């Protein structure tokens, strides 16, 4: 359930309670009776609408979407007045779900290497070339090709 729905429900309950208390007090005192609706069918909807809107202030009337107009400054003050630091710290400290190192490494490995800066430059190993001929073969070649010194 969203927070906004919960707030709306609480507001409705608050209005019902305040309405029940105020209506019982009003009945005891001598006040004007509510205007009755005429029995003629024409204009009945307009009369109902007028009766419903009598209690609302002009700036608090519902808009086309059924929302009540509120000041943006009031909403900001409501939100900024709350300090969620302690609640957030408690949540972060109480969380006991720690992922294993294998899972973390797998995720990091999956995301690594997608950008050009992450690509490692592979250095080719310089393999020492082994000669097919041994030292004895070279000496024999020298003697045959250059002759004896």
Curated annotation (Swiss-Prot):
Which GO cellular component terms, listed alphabetically, does the Swiss-Prot or TrEMBL entry include?
nucleolus; small-subunit processome
Q: Where is this region: Disordered?
A: 1-64
Q: Which GO terms describe its biological process?
A: ribosomal small subunit biogenesis
| Localization per Swiss-Prot or TrEMBL | Nucleus, Nucleolus
Query: Superkingdom of the source?
Result: Eukaryota
InterPro entries in the record, alphabetically?
AROS (IPR023262)
Comp. bias regions, Basic and acidic residues: 8-19
Q: Where is the composition biased (Low complexity)?
A: 30-41
Keywords (A to Z) from UniProt: Nucleus
Please list the residue ranges that the record marks as compositionally biased, kind Basic residues. Answer: 43-52
Q: Mention any Pfam family matching this sequence.
A: AROS
Quaternary structure, from the entry? Part of the small subunit (SSU) processome, composed of more than 70 proteins and the RNA chaperone small nucleolar RNA (snoRNA) U3.
Which family does the record claim for this protein? Belongs to the AROS family.
Q: What does this protein do?
A: Part of the small subunit (SSU) processome, first precursor of the small eukaryotic ribosomal subunit. During the assembly of the SSU processome in the nucleolus, many ribosome biogenesis factors, an RNA chaperone and ribosomal proteins associate with the nascent pre-rRNA and work in concert to generate RNA folding, modifications, rearrangements and cleavage as well as targeted degradation of pre-ribosomal RNA by the RNA exosome. Acts as a chaperone that specifically mediates the integration of RPS19 in state post-A1. Direct regulator of SIRT1.
Name of protein: Active regulator of SIRT1
Q: Which organism is it from?
A: Xenopus tropicalis
């Amino acid at each position: 359930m969203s927070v906004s729905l919960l707030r709306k429900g609480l507001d409705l309950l608050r209005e019902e309670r305040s309405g029940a208390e105020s209506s019982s007090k009003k009945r005891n005192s001598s006040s004007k009776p509510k205007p009755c609706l005429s029995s003629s069918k024409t204009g009945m909807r307009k009369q109902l609408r007028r009766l419903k809107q009598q209690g609302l202030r002009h700036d608090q009337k519902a808009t086309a979407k059924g929302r009540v107009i509120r000041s943006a400054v009031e909403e900001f003050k409501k939100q900024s007045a709350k300090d969620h630091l302690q609640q957030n710290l408690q949540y972060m400290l109480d969380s006991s779900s720690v992922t294993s190192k294998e899972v973390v490494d797998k995720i990091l490995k999956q995301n690594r290497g997608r950008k050009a800066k992450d690509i490692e430059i592979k250095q080719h190993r310089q393999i020492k070339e082994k000669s097919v001929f041994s030292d004895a073969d070279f000496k024999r070649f020298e003697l045959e090709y250059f002759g004896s010194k």
